[in-house]
Amino acid sequence: LLPVIPANGGTLLPETQRYDLSYQLYQEDDDRMRIESWYVRGNADFGDLGSFRFQYLNDAISGASPTGALSGGVQPFYAELEDVREGILGAYAHQFGDHRVEMELSYSEEDDYISRGLALSDSIELNDKNTTLSFGLNLLDDTVKVHLLDDKEKNSFDFFTGVSQIIDKNTVVSANLTLGFNDGYLNDAYEVV
């Protein structure tokens, strides 16, 4: 979505809001894989009340993916696939002194997979805003729809922490650590080996 510019040269949207629409196309040779993606994103800053951002996505994938099997064997070398994924993400952030706390909710669905997510994070500014400490966690509650079987659950938990330091106007140094755990159905339906 593009900002509307009235005849007087101003914009109809406040400078604290931003919206955009994007399209991506990935196409491999021999029609092996084709991925089309549409994204609608927005961000609005409400001053002391915090800020809100969102994203809607629609991905379509078609083609064939290698299974890991040897060519000419009993198992097929390629697995044909066609799927559409729709997802939405919303996040609210609020500044509390030197802390910026954010909560993010997400949901996406495709033919054989549903994902529900919750993320919480905090960024602390120190040293006249030259140093930022960040930490947070991410929880995913997924459902995998397995052909000829009951739906399977998959859960993921990630914790991250990091620090960034402004050295000068052209240099920022950062270090980050992420630790993740997965539980439940972890199989890939497109691999046979």
Feature map (PLM): residue ranges:
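Repeated loop/turn-to-beta-strand initiation elements of outer-membrane beta-barrel proteins
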Residues: 50-54, 98-103, 128-133, 170-175
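Transmembrane beta-barrel domains of outer membrane proteins
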Residues: 43-45, 91-95, 123-125, 160-168, ...
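Transmembrane beta-barrel outer-membrane domains
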Residues: 31-35, 79-85, 111-115, 126-128, ...
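Outer-membrane beta-barrel translocator domains and adjoining extracellular loop/strand segments
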Residues: 31-36, 55, 65-71, 113-121, ...
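Transmembrane beta-strands of outer-membrane beta-barrel pores
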Residues: 23-29, 58-62, 96-98, 107-111, ...
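Hydrophobic, lipid-facing positions within transmembrane beta-strands of outer-membrane proteins
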Residues: 36-40, 86-90, 116-120, 155-161
